[in-house]
From Swiss-Prot:
The keyword Glycosyltransferase is annotated on this UniProt entry: yes
Biological process according to GO: glycogen biosynthetic process
Job of this protein: Synthesizes alpha-1,4-glucan chains using ADP-glucose.
Organism: Serratia proteamaculans (strain 568)
The protein, known as: Glycogen synthase
SUPFAM superfamilies given in the database record: UDP-Glycosyltransferase/glycogen phosphorylase
Top-level division of the source organism's lineage: Bacteria
Pfam families to which the protein is assigned, alphabetical: Glyco_transf_5, Glycos_transf_1
Catalysed reaction equations from the record: [(1->4)-alpha-D-glucosyl](n) + ADP-alpha-D-glucose = [(1->4)-alpha-D-glucosyl](n+1) + ADP + H(+)
Keyword Transferase: yes
Listed NCBIfam families: glgA (TIGR02095), PRK00654.1-2 (NF001899)
Length: 477
């Protein structure tokens, strides 16, 4: 089965969010399961620099000018690069300029990504041709539309990593992008008078997947559907919508081999985890005391991630003797509020604004609890990292958080299935109650260790997801 993943970023070549982690791990896992899998990416500077030995496969005239298709390998995965420097050779973010303004030609930049995927399906590389094109999020959504417009030269899968990002552009770009004018209607690309790259993926794909079973159900409801719920309900009725849970890349996230940690550890040697905690407390300027429960946040600072709830619940957490270590960036108001808390409580609150991959490992390896109180969370990877590292997740019951964390309720503690702390209502009171339950369990070290060891034993590796996707591809073909 020849499969082409189409996406805008891939860890560790280029990462702005969890999408990159998924694409950085899933193709390799599918290859390990016997798939013939490659990836198509725009040749952004970091991507091009990470694959310096790529060779030119083909050149082709497109709506964006004459572009090159290059091919190389990265850690055993074949990578196609779209060589169009006038579109992709820009510093910083692949999506916006240094003033955080989206590039005015993003419609062209990411339409080309979808168009080139279709050209590969039509035989642009005469030595390799995908049977399935697997597009990820809005950036690649037009791949499904171009395949439909060209007689379906390959089957298509579209994965929703986050429905909130829809890739909306003016309708007048439709003919410029070599799309059939008939595609711009309610049964196609049109979304409230604009062209939606996300809707293109949802409408034209042979099958839609969401990144967790719960999120696949949630997005058929108005509160999570962002206006797409009607289409998604129809795809659900047709059996063309399913949820496949993301996994953890064991080569990157494994506390027994993680070079970023002060001390490596596993479920049978948790004493070394305490060394990471003491190092983290010192690095964040907190009181260095192993007995204090250390809560952590590694997240974009947005209301979607529930960080305003963390602020509301923070006084109670501190009153109960807890500490908070936060790594993240985002909303300026939230950033300032957390920095103010760190200034007011320097021994209990440590804040680092920004995102540093290595430091995220040290926080997750050193903390006792990782908080993910999201209003919605398609899958979430942070809680999976927490489970793997014995850093108990405290999460809201939504999306992939609901699918991966089992609450420390008495019955779950009794049968050994508990792996973290789960709350339902989206408010600071519910979060505060979950924090209290974490504090109570912390005061019982024997029970805490029991839950830790179970959490670390749960397998969220990519092999299961890789097999599920390969089975889906087989059904489609």
């Amino acid at each position: 089965m020849q499969v082409l993943h189409v996406c805008s970023e891939m860890f560790p070549l280029l990462k702005t969010g969890g999408l990159a982690d998924v694409v950085g791990a899933l193709p390799a896992a599918q290859i390990a399961e016997g798939g013939d899998v490659r990836v198509l990416l725009p040749a952004f500077p970091d991507v091009r620099n990470g694959i310096p030995d790529s060779v030119l496969v083909a050149e082709i005239d497109s709506f964006a000018g004459r572009v090159g298709l290059r091919y190389g390998t990265y850690h055993g995965v074949g990578i196609y690069l779209i060589d169009a420097p006038w579109l992709y050779e820009r510093p910083g973010s692949p999506y916006h300029d240094q003033s955080m303004n989206a590039y005015s030609d993003n419609h062209r930049r990411f339409a080309l990504l979808g168009w080139m995927a279709c050209e590969l399906a039509k035989g642009l590389d005469r030595y390799w041709r995908p049977q399935v094109v697997h597009a990820h999020d809005w950036h690649a959504g037009l791949a499904c539309a171009y395949l439909a417009a060209n007689g379906h030269p390959a089957r298509s899968v579209f994965t929703v990593h986050n429905l909130a990002y829809q890739g909306l552009f003016s309708a007048h770009h439709v003919p410029e992008l070599w799309l059939p004018p008939s595609f711009f209607n309610i049964y196609g690309l049109e979304f409230y008078g604009q062209m939606s790259f996300l809707k293109a993926g949802l409408f034209y794909a042979d099958h839609i997947t969401a990144v967790s079973p719960t999120y696949a159900r949630e997005i058929t409801r108005p509160e999570f559907g962002y206006g797409m719920e009607g289409l998604l309900q129809e795809r659900q009725r047709q059996g063309r919508l399913s949820g496949i849970l993301n996994g953890v890349d064991d080569k990157i996230w494994d506390p027994s081999h993680d070079p970023r940690l002060t001390a490596r550890y596993d479920a049978d040697n948790l004493k070394n985890k305490a060394k990471n905690k003491l190092h983290l407390q010192k690095a964040m300027g907190l009181k260095v005391d192993e007995s204090l429960p250390l809560f952590a946040v590694v997240s974009r600072l947005t209301s979607q991630k529930g960080l305003d709830l963390v602020l509301e619940a923070l006084p109670a957490l501190l009153e109960q003797g807890g500490q908070l270590a936060l790594l993240g960036a985002g909303d300026a108001v939230l950033q300032q509020a957390f920095l103010a808390a760190a200034a007011d409580y320097p021994e209990q609150v440590g804040v680092q604004i920004g995102y540093h991959e290595a430091f995220s490992h040290r926080i997750i390896g050193g903390a006792d609890v990782i908080m993910v109180p999201s209003r919605f969370e398609p899958c979430g990877l942070t809680q999976l990292y927490g489970l793997k590292y014995g850093t108990l997740p405290l999460v809201r019951r939504t999306g992939g958080l609901a699918d991966t964390v089992v609450d420390c309720a008495l019955e779950n503690l009794a049968d050994g299935s508990a792996s973290g702390f789960v709350f339902d209502d989206c408010d600071a009171v519910a979060l505060g109650n979950a924090i209290r339950r974490a504090m109570v369990l912390w005061s019982r070290p024997k029970h805490w260790r029991h839950v830790q060891r179970h959490a670390m034993s749960v397998d969220f590796g990519w092999q299961v997801a890789a097999q599920e996707y390969l089975s889906l591809y087989q059904r489609l073909s």
